[in-house]
């Protein structure tokens, strides 16, 4: 299966955006990097480095099933809402790249469900997401009036959190789940590069930048609410104390 590659070695080949003609925004300052810095500044203001012990202990089987269930739910919803964007994505380059991402998210859902099946869970029918997760993933992510607003929310803020989370949490995972996420992480990194390309090419006016920044900030706030909801859920299930550091869900 042919994939798109932006830089460095990888499985994605034949970048459809590598045309000789310059496109709008190609020579613009790297607003993407500014947005990354903005998110990291906000994150550093609320995270307590003394609570990093969350990442230094193995998951219990119960918590692992809960975490994998969340990830499967997230990946399935991402496949569905990104697929829903395609009919209203006027930019041909973004359309091609987002269509590739839909397939990736579907495969990630399958990988998570396989890991759950090895633990006796074959369906999410009896698993209910927290209200904060539904507001964040089911309501907010599918919204956005333009491609750059949608990509700023999910492929920037969301995928940045996911990449960081998976790398940090990986040592806590059993070997079979590590192998699954070793397949997922490069895709998440590609999705960030996809987002950067779209933002650089199509976020070109001051109004564009203002709308993108607003989406980034609101997504960050919903992500934080989602993490707190995860802690409350773990405490309610007797898996962890309410004061434990929350995982970077996504």
Please provide the spans of the model-predicted regions:
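Non-heme di-metal
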Residues: 2-250
